């Protein structure tokens, strides 16, 4: 793939790996583009590449840690990781972090079983198990009960039993069937800086969810960062720390989740879809 971007690069080649995270099989889970860089490119170039990739998130990383990162938690491989949607840079993305760990631990450091990532959300860690699963360690995110926003309820077309706000807006429904049947009008969502999560007790897992946000990808296939908020909620309501979860998007995804103090551990598999090269060509 050749992309004309602002700047002077000659014909700089950048590897691109598309990896499905939280995937039971090919064509499931959430795809992320993973792009290792020798050094950071200008932010506008990163944004253009993410827009061209047109996936929910593109993960860019470099082995060059910024001075304010401090020391990584251990001596395992550590990189500086950033996430971009097709529209803007974001503060946290679980599935793209897991996908990046899979690429690093499979391609660059096959003898290691842990990778650290310095991000806008601080240090994150992913471990690889003996069964080739990946364990993503995220900060547990709080939620506060609120009165449901009538405009949001109307746009989602659901009848929530409960509404909470935090990193995302959460509407708790009565059943898995209601979550599965929901047909939100995402374009009618009120102006929100956050995503909207529909969740309920599950028939096929301890809890289920779907994640919506206006933009290039209105429904996210599997959202690791949303589970950093959902796991503390459901662990408290169900009275146990170890939970199973399903995200009921068209692609679908399964997660095993643990609330460990102020951290959330998410376990899933990764499937590599493609490896390629992007040529950043000077515009003509």
Spans of features found by a protein language model:
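Active-site proximal loop and beta-alpha junction motif in alpha/beta enzyme cores
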Residues: 3-92, 97-284
């Amino acid at each position: 793939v050749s992309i004309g971007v602002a700047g002077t690069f000659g014909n700089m080649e950048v590897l691109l790996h598309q990896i499905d995270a939280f995937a039971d099989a090919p064509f499931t889970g959430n795809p992320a583009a993973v792009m290792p860089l020798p050094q950071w490119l200008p932010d506008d170039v990163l944004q253009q590449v993410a827009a061209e990739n047109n996936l929910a998130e593109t993960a860019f990383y470099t082995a060059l840690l910024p001075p304010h990162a401090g020391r990584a938690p251990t001596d395992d491989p550590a990189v500086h990781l950033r996430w971009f949607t097709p529209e803007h840079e974001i503060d946290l993305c679980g599935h793209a972090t897991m996908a990046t760990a899979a690429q690093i631990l499979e391609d660059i450091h096959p003898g290691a079983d842990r990778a650290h990532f310095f991000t806008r959300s601080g240090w994150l860690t992913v471990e690889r198990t003996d069964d080739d699963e990946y364990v993503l360690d995220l900060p547990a995110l709080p939620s506060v009960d609120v009165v449901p926003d009538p405009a949001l309820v109307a746009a989602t077309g659901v009848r929530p039993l409960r509404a909470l706000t935090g990193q995302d807006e959460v509407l708790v429904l009565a059943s898995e069937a209601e979550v599965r049947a929901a047909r939100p009008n995402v374009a009618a969502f009120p102006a929100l800086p956050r995503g909207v999560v529909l969740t309920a007790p599950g028939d096929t897992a301890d809890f289920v969810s779907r994640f919506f946000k206006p933009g290039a990808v209105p429904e996210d296939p599997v959202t690791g960062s949303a589970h950093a908020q959902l796991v503390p909620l459901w662990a408290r309501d169900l009275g146990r720390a170890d939970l199973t979860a399903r995200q009921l998007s068209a692609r679908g995804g399964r997660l095993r989740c643990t609330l460990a103090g102020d951290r959330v551990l998410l376990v899933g598999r990764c499937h590599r879809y493609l490896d390629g090269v992007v040529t950043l060509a000077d515009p003509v």
